[in-house]
Amino acid sequence: MTTGFSVAVAGASGYAGGEILRLLLAHPAYTAGRLRIGVLTAGSNAGSSLIEHHPNLTPLADHKLQPTDSTLLRGHDVVFLALPHGSSAKIAEELGPQTLIIDCGADFRLTDAAAWERYYGSKHAGSWPYGLPELPGGRDALHGTKRVAVPGCYPTAALLALSPAVTAGLVEPSVTVVAVSGTTGAGRAPKAELLASEVMGSARAYNIAGAHRHTPEIAQGLKHPSGGPVSVSFTPVLIPMPRGILATCTAPTTASLSEIRDAYEDAYRTEEFIHVLPEGHLPTTKAVVGSNAVHIGLAVDPDAGVLVAVAAIDNLVKGTAGAAIQSMNLALGWPEADGLSIVGVAP
């Protein structure tokens, strides 16, 4: 087991960076004095105090935000990158191979260079082990790694909702995902469409019909036994709440609900963070807020011949920062659940 190490967070003034720090402060390695929180960086917020942006992080009140520069990040054992998409590749290249780098952006998620260039409009930087250990083979790829690509928040919910059925061949390789998300999923940069007066009392679909950048990531993570690609229709919807994603996923099936439930229970039996709810129960976002938990409800529509799988996550925890901490634990050989809760904050 690795002991005595320092952690840096680039992009610490944003929602993801702040949530990483919140989870680190509760991590057993930090409370035991084996984890030291080092340099914290920001872009336009460099020079300000962390506490100005995250007043909940009072143990770190004396930390000033530094400019995001690889020279300041060097020398840390672990570096979390919570930066805008396209910003991580250059910094990662400048850090040494012995640094554990955990990227919360999209730079290294996609394996298909053409898909990256289509959706992100820049040169593909490559791919890293994907930080979703609950997928088939995912955990093995993270043990001892020095590089992690944290999944997107929507793909996390959709993949965990669908993977057991798709992998077992219980559904056709064509899925539909309609997912509602809170406003923190759009980041902290000021945008007119995220003003309270625009969001409150309204719901808005956006980047529909294959336009959302998470569409190829969902397709990439689904493995059908036919060996062919899985087509994905993805519709994201912004709703007026700060945290949470509820993904309602459907796929054609001739299987019974009993067969499908057996596949999910087999896939997730030993997964601490995933809870397949009892038959007839459906997840709610408020039950998982603040936790790394995933709640999944299952049903089969016999008239339409489709599986309906519904997953709820906290987009800032299991959808970002929690996955980053979980991946760090695996990479360092620590207990996977260290610093992470399965208990949400309710009401």
From Swiss-Prot:
Alphabetized GO MF terms: N-acetyl-gamma-glutamyl-phosphate reductase activity; NAD binding; NADP+ binding
Main location: cytoplasm
Gene coding for it: argC
NADP is among the record's keywords: yes
Record bears the keyword Cell cycle: no
PANTHER family per record: N-ACETYL-GAMMA-GLUTAMYL-PHOSPHATE REDUCTASE, CHLOROPLASTIC-RELATED, N-ACETYL-GAMMA-GLUTAMYL-PHOSPHATE REDUCTASE, CHLOROPLASTIC-RELATED-RELATED
Keywords, in A-Z order: Amino-acid biosynthesis, Arginine biosynthesis, Cytoplasm, NADP, Oxidoreductase
Pathway the protein takes part in: Amino-acid biosynthesis; L-arginine biosynthesis; N(2)-acetyl-L-ornithine from L-glutamate: step 3/4
Species this protein is from: Mycobacteroides abscessus (strain ATCC 19977 / DSM 44196 / CCUG 20993 / CIP 104536 / JCM 13569 / NCTC 13031 / TMC 1543 / L948) (Mycobacterium abscessus)
High-level lineage: Bacteria, Bacillati, Actinomycetota, Actinomycetes, Mycobacteriales
Entry protein name: N-acetyl-gamma-glutamyl-phosphate reductase
